[in-house]
């Protein structure tokens, strides 16, 4: 399980160094093999260990290519999916088209989200956090049952 937000830097070749605390888990669970794709709702990337991505691919394969909405989701997620292998120094090369989609230049937030990471431009990440907090403070909608049961 991945959690927490960590500032990492992209080098001049577009590689980011995975924080040490995640490396062993990624090597054990995925032999360092990762898949990166776009997030279809936010200007960030999704970074999955390969076994987790394969579960997503199976679910995507069950969608109908005849349904325009389902086909669009397949096209966006699979069409942007890029395999990346963690090297001996714990670095991952993020494809240029993916970096461009998320506006990643130098400083990147690596955000743990259970079975995957999100990769955000640092400035965009903090803007999103502020928007999310503001939305929660002014929320008028009713909490779902699952959120009502969540006690923090």
Curated annotation (Swiss-Prot):
Record-linked InterPro entries: MraZ, MraZ_C, MraZ_dom, MraZ_N, MraZ_sf, SpoVT-AbrB_dom, SpoVT-AbrB_sf
MF terms in GO: DNA-binding transcription factor activity; transcription cis-regulatory region binding
First-listed, main subcellular location of the protein, grouped into a coarse class: cytoplasm
GO CC entries: cytoplasm; nucleoid
Record keywords, A-Z: Cytoplasm, DNA-binding, Repeat, Repressor, Transcription, Transcription regulation
SpoVT-AbrB domain span: 5-52, 81-124
Location in the cell: Cytoplasm, Nucleoid
Biological process terms in GO annotation: negative regulation of DNA-templated transcription initiation
Keyword Repeat included in the entry's annotation: yes
Pfam families in UniProt: MraZ (PF02381)
Keyword Iron-sulfur: no
SUPFAM superfamilies xref list: AbrB/MazE/MraZ-like
Subunit record text: Forms oligomers.
NCBIfam families per UniProt: division/cell wall cluster transcriptional repressor MraZ
Family: Belongs to the MraZ family.
Protein task: Negatively regulates its own expression and that of the subsequent genes in the proximal part of the division and cell wall (dcw) gene cluster. Acts by binding directly to DNA. May also regulate the expression of genes outside the dcw cluster.
Protein name (database record): Transcriptional regulator MraZ
Species for this entry: Salmonella typhimurium (strain LT2 / SGSC1412 / ATCC 700720)
Higher taxonomy: Bacteria, Pseudomonadati, Pseudomonadota, Gammaproteobacteria, Enterobacterales
Gene: mraZ
